[in-house]
Amino acid sequence: GGKVIDVAKLASYDKNVFFVSMPTTASHDGIVSPLASIKNPKTSTSAKAHAPIAVIADSKIIANSPFRLLSAGCADLISNFTAIKDWQLAHRLKNESYSESAASLSIMSAKMITDNVDSIKPGLEESARLVVKTLFSSGMAISIAGSSRPASGSEHTFSHALDKILDKPCLHGEQCGVGTILMMYLY
């Protein structure tokens, strides 16, 4: 899961050694990104870490994990649409660094999900494969940009706010999905 992979990323970074990511679910793009999510009861931050040298994802295991996790991964990917809009706005208004290649890869990842939404089904290895591939490319966009901007914007800020105020927050991707709907309405 995400916590174990984040610990491996941080340890890899701290010891300056390679690591291999072996996700058992496909619930977020952290399986390949060069950032680790550090959470405690009051805050959530991202720390610089190593991206994996390889990812080994067994599509059968992922397909047999709870479908809610795969759905959360899809919602995390769809949030790339608002993340890119936010990044473009920051570039235009604040002259923030912007990478067209990272943005394009991020949008492509989100579009692969929306274009294939009808074929993403519980227990189907092809569904797991598609979601893992798109999570992988979304995480690669983060590596290209050198920041989380291609995959994290106002919808993620909304999710972090929910983490603080809810007694029992939902899955990260679920919260980002709701945040995406709200933020896209503002655009």
Predicted regions and their residues:
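Generic hydrophobic alpha-helical membrane-span motif
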Residues: 8, 29, 64, 160-162
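Gly/Ser/Thr-rich loops at beta-strand to alpha-helix junctions
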Residues: 1-5, 27, 148
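Basic, gly/Ser/Thr/Pro-rich low-complexity segments located predominantly at protein N termini
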Residues: 6-7, 35, 144, 178
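N-terminal small/polar loop signature for handling phosphorylated ligands or for N-terminal nucleophile
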Residues: 1-20, 119-130
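A glycine/threonine-rich phosphate-anchoring loop and its flanking beta-alpha core
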Residues: 13-111
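Active-site segments that bind and position negatively charged phosphate/pyrophosphate groups
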Residues: 102-187
